[in-house]
């Protein structure tokens, strides 16, 4: 329940733009947020391995 309220709070327009922080829209995780893909690292990895993100391939060397 707390995560839902934090997600709702993150979507509101704040009085000062500095106070805004990024939160994953899929799971609500506030940390390890990738700005380029607008999701957290865990959701990014899950979707990249499933092939849902275009242009992302698994690295091997």
From Swiss-Prot:
Q: Does the keyword Lipid metabolism apply?
A: no
Keywords (A to Z) from UniProt: Metal-binding, Ribonucleoprotein, Ribosomal protein, RNA-binding, rRNA-binding, Zinc
Cofactor(s) the record lists = Zn(2+)
Task: State any GO CC term.
Answer: small ribosomal subunit
Gene Ontology BP, a term: translation
Tell me which PROSITE patterns the record gives. Answer: RIBOSOMAL_S14
One molecular function GO term is: structural constituent of ribosome
Q: Which domain of life is it from?
A: Bacteria
User: What does the record say about how the cofactor binds?
Assistant: Binds 1 zinc ion per subunit.
Concerning SUPFAM superfamilies, the annotation shows:
Glucocorticoid receptor-like (DNA-binding domain)
Pfam families attached to this UniProt entry:
Ribosomal_S14
Q: Which InterPro entries did the record assign?
A: Ribosomal_uS14, Ribosomal_uS14_bact, Ribosomal_uS14_CS, Ribosomal_uS14_sf
The UniProt record gives the binding positions of Zn(2+) as 24, 27, 40, 43
Q: Which family does it belong to?
A: Belongs to the universal ribosomal protein uS14 family. Zinc-binding uS14 subfamily.
Summarize subunit and interaction data from the UniProt record for this chain: Part of the 30S ribosomal subunit. Contacts proteins S3 and S10.
The record's annotation in HAMAP family points to: Ribosomal_uS14_2_B (MF_01364_B)
Record function comment: Binds 16S rRNA, required for the assembly of 30S particles and may also be responsible for determining the conformation of the 16S rRNA at the A site.
Q: What is this protein called?
A: Small ribosomal subunit protein uS14
Q: Which species does the entry assign this protein to?
A: Anaeromyxobacter dehalogenans (strain 2CP-C)
Q: Which gene encodes it?
A: rpsZ
């Amino acid at each position: 329940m707390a995560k839902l309220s934090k997600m709702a709070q993150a979507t509101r327009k704040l009085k000062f733009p500095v106070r805004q922080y990024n939160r994953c829209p899929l799971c609500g995780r506030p940390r390890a947020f990738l700005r380029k893909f607008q999701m957290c690292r865990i959701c990014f990895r899950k979707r990249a391995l499933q092939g849902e993100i275009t242009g992302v391939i698994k690295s091997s060397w």
